[in-house]
């Protein structure tokens, strides 16, 4: 994947001058939601969570020749009366392309009703689409137009709750055969509660053998952490991989490591990974994950979500 942002934005060559404009993140609400487009370097999928707690957060997926070329997580954050953008890129296995440290923030340069420019990055809004103009040094510019895909999401019957809500794989056991289409019901924009605060997830639908999602956790009107998540086809089955990030996108895991949850079993509207469960409910979506305790023990933590309404 070329070393350019997968963001719904474009690279510019000139740095910012003067003081950054004073604003909050609310004027960028139009970026929220799902976007898709094609360009010379392949297909770009993006899903942005709307403004909350002074931030926006997005997941990006690049597809080339029918295969995932890489993922990225991006945030736009209120800072010192203005905005900064941060971006971290990863390969198809969620191995990092940068260090574990938080990426250098890009200051806001200008903002209007139809355009936003950060240091080195620009996006132009044109009707119902976003135009990316990528000016890559020593290379030809790339232009990509992203539009909102039309999604028909069929009704998904709720799954039957099981006890215990989280299962763990038996030593030496194999994961069952499965394709990402089996968890297509995970796609969408979800908001709810978990870990004593607000939890939000946005999932891109299946493509090129993967789903990709972003998580934002908020407690006390402050972001506590983010996650970049994927569900991928691996060894004839599925695995959920994720990476955690501090509010400045400093990685909790080392760049080459992602937390992995192999599939244990799946049903039409539930997926039981090793230590993590997703299932559809009558109200939306429920997730359970085994979390560690300070005394070395563990306990299951519940997250419950409803579809975000426009």
Q: What is the role of each PLM region?
A:
Residues 5-14:
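Bacterial N-terminal signal peptides
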Residues 37-119, 177, 193-272:
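Central antiparallel beta-sheet cores of small beta-barrel/beta-sandwich binding domains
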């Amino acid at each position: 994947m070329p070393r350019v942002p997968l963001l719904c934005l474009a690279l510019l060559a000139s740095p910012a001058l003067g003081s950054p404009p004073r604003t909050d993140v609310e004027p960028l609400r139009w970026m929220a939601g799902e976007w898709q487009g094609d360009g010379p370097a392949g297909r770009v999928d993006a899903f942005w969570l709307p403004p909350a707690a002074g931030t926006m957060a997005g997941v990006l997926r690049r597809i080339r020749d029918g295969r995932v070329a890489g993922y990225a997580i991006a945030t736009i954050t209120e800072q010192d009366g203005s905005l900064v953008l941060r971006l971290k890129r990863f390969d198809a296995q969620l191995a990092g392309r940068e260090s574990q440290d938080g990426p250098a923030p890009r200051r806001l340069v200008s903002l209007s009703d139809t355009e936003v420019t950060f240091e080195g990055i620009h996006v132009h809004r044109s009707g119902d689409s976003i135009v990316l103009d990528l000016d890559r040094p020593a290379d030809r510019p790339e232009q990509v137009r992203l539009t909102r895909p039309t999604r028909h999401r069929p009704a998904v019957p709720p799954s039957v709750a099981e006890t215990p809500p989280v299962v763990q794989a038996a030593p030496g056991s194999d994961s069952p055969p499965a394709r990402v289409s089996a968890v297509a019901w995970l796609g969408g924009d979800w908001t709810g509660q978990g870990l004593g605060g607000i939890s939000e997830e946005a999932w891109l639908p299946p493509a090129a053998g993967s789903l990709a999602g972003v998580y934002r956790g908020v407690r006390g009107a402050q972001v506590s952490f983010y996650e970049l998540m994927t569900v991928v086809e691996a060894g004839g089955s599925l695995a959920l991989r994720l990476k955690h990030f501090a509010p400045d996108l400093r990685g909790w895991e080392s760049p080459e490591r992602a937390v992995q949850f192999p599939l244990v079993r799946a049903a039409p509207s539930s997926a039981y990974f090793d230590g993590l469960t997703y299932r559809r409910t009558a109200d939306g979506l429920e997730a359970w994950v085994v979390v560690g305790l300070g005394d070395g023990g563990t306990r299951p933590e519940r997250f419950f979500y409803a579809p975000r309404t426009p």
